[in-house]
């Protein structure tokens, strides 16, 4: 393989766990790890400007291959000079392969060795996505980090189905590597699958590591399994991945899952969670989730989170934000989205410091106790 445009630099290992502090070097800059990546599905992180994302120290964002292929089209993005120019973002971008959306959004899917035929969710047109096409789209988009086309089987699928699926995903990964036109300035990651089966995760990992990708993703989690089941898969999967390459846990954004993923050696995470729940008036705070649109906050003139120094918490009250959301004002969604993204990015900063201080287990215990996992919303 040619020299990879994506390099991982290990800075420090935490003494008591698998957590590691590092940085990832890309053609559009360097970002620290562990890192949470805000999701910009349609080439925008919903309601946020690039300047606001930089303000909250989002070192890298994610864009969605499936959605951008359907609209506005990857050829148009290429003519615009690639995603970075198209959306005015000069820092790293990661694109997914489109596979997860094909399996979760599209109708009437038919999976064969060649690829996946489906009806697109916008207009019902018949579409055909292959490993080569997924790579071609991402080459046009021009992201720094690309994903191989994979199948994401449901966590509780039968063993024989998952075995056939991971073997096909490995063949697809090899086809994607061969189709990659820009290995000099775009790094392609392989995606480990295998549901909850340890031997299949091992087989999938061995297949992909033998292909020498610049980085590896752990897929097929956060799809309905329990928190304990996710941790168990990470316990036996992450140690199999090369120490000198980035490790990316796909689709995970709950605070406890971020901390537990880091403890098990994961470097990168993404999820739509912070912006999706923000649009329903749900805010993550140091004391747990707060549903600001609830009536109890109508005359609450305090910030969303007393321990947060984000723009929203420094300038606006729960009562005002509740009013905006009840009145269907976009500014309310902007304020809650900003806060939730800031909360997770700030959490990752604290996690990085805990790795430096070799006390991530104590940090986890303190965070979980304050956040109040297992209790319903209370007054605070």
From Swiss-Prot:
Keyword Zinc appears in the UniProt entry: yes
Keyword Cytoplasm attributed: no
Catalytic activity: 7-aminomethyl-7-carbaguanine + guanosine(34) in tRNA = 7-aminomethyl-7-carbaguanosine(34) in tRNA + guanine
Catalytic site: 96 (proton acceptor), 270 (nucleophile)
Key words of the record: Glycosyltransferase, Metal-binding, Queuosine biosynthesis, Transferase, tRNA processing, Zinc
Cofactor names: Zn(2+)
Binding positions (substrate): 96-100, 150, 193, 220
UniProt region (RNA binding), positions on chain: 251-257, 275-279
Cofactor: binding comment: Binds 1 zinc ion per subunit.
GO biological process: queuosine biosynthetic process; tRNA wobble guanine modification; tRNA-guanine transglycosylation
Entry binding sites for Zn(2+): 308, 310, 313, 339
Domain of life: Bacteria
Function: Catalyzes the base-exchange of a guanine (G) residue with the queuine precursor 7-aminomethyl-7-deazaguanine (PreQ1) at position 34 (anticodon wobble position) in tRNAs with GU(N) anticodons (tRNA-Asp, -Asn, -His and -Tyr). Catalysis occurs through a double-displacement mechanism. The nucleophile active site attacks the C1' of nucleotide 34 to detach the guanine base from the RNA, forming a covalent enzyme-RNA intermediate. The proton acceptor active site deprotonates the incoming PreQ1, allowing a nucleophilic attack on the C1' of the ribose to form the product.
Descriptive protein name: Queuine tRNA-ribosyltransferase
Gene coding for it: tgt
